[in-house]
């Protein structure tokens, strides 16, 4: 979930929005909440400060720190470096178990990125090992803040990139994320009265419609470049041009930079096709082309499928290698 300025960019009802607003700012802005301990680490050209708020956790802080480091390493591996040079994470204990809420802001108190994580006091190591949300929130730092009608791009990117980054880092297997995509991508299909991604702000279209855009773009870029480049190259170029969460950009500017990096027009053309009209994706056909075959609750791969090499390239650890945290 991403917060930009004073508007919470999340496809939820007005009543739910009011409740989230009240919870987030009940004790003042989250970045001003009390801190009882603090640690920092370096990764991929960045310094990440991790603060722990009031309250206790069943887990030692060192185990929580390792979870944050693993998530940062996944994102830095995908982008070749951590997207912003100064980042802050606030861990606030709360009653319950698991990661209860995550929100990311840009340009707060000297930090390019600031993420607040509400972590259940009874959270276990297994919960952290299986978590996706910390990585999702870090991905938000790697794209400029957009006007509200483009929330689908911000959330869709984080939804699509998070599992791929974790595979590239070695924390997930490709079979797992392709099975998850086969299961979840249909949630982004347009329904009746859909008016395109810029104008249809349901939860499904915001998160999974945005993810469908990213998957299509990744495959199309690789098709047009003989698999030499993909969405990853476009997104790295956007970050390298300064397109991070603390900057307000028009979406088209970011897409044009990405297209220039891949030598294609895929991002701009796909956006123009999907922005104002429903454009259903033939997911069944795409899975077949990629060689992803349902097998019980999971999937198996057909490495002789027409686009099998593209599927493999999407999750392959980049040539720049794994980026590890340092003290």
Please report, for each region that a protein language model flagged, where it lies by residue.
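Secretory-pathway/luminal and periplasmic proteins that interact with or process carbohydrate-rich
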Residues: 96-102, 166-171, 243-249, 280-281
């Amino acid at each position: 979930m991403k917060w930009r300025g004073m508007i919470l960019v999340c496809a939820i009802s007005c009543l739910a929005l009011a409740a989230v607003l009240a919870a987030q700012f009940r004790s003042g802005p989250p970045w001003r909440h009390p801190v009882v301990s603090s640690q920092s680490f370096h990764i991929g050209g960045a310094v990440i400060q991790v603060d722990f708020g009031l309250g206790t956790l069943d887990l030692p802080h060192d185990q929580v720190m390792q979870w944050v480091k693993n998530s940062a390493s996944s994102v830095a591996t995908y982008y070749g470096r951590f997207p912003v040079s100064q980042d802050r994470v606030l861990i606030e204990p709360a009653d319950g178990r698991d990661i209860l809420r995550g929100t990311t802001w840009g340009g707060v108190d000297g930090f390019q990125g600031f993420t607040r994580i509400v972590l259940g006091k009874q959270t276990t190591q297994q919960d952290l090992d299986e978590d996706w949300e910390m990585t999702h929130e870090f991905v938000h730092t790697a794209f400029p803040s957009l006007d509200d009608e483009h929330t689908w791009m911000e959330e869709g990117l984080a939804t699509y990139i998070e599992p791929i980054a974790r595979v590239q880092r070695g924390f997930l297997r490709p079979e797992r994320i392709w099975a998850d995509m086969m299961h979840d991508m249909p949630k982004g299909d347009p329904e009746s009265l859909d008016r395109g991604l810029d104008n249809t702000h349901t939860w499904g279209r915001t998160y999974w419609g945005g993810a469908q855009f990213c998957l299509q773009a990744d495959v199309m870029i690789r098709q047009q470049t003989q698999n030499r480049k993909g969405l990853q190259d476009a997104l790295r170029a956007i970050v390298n041009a300064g397109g991070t969460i603390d900057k307000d950009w028009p979406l088209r500017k970011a897409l044009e930079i990405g297209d220039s990096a891949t030598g294609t027009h895929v991002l701009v053309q796909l956006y123009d096709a999907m922005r104002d009209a429903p454009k259903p994706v033939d997911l069944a056909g795409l899975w077949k082309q990629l060689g992803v075959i349902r097998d019980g609750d999971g999937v198996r791969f057909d490495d002789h499928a027409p686009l099998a090499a593209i599927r493999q390239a999407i999750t392959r650890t980049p040539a720049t290698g794994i980026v590890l945290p340092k003290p």
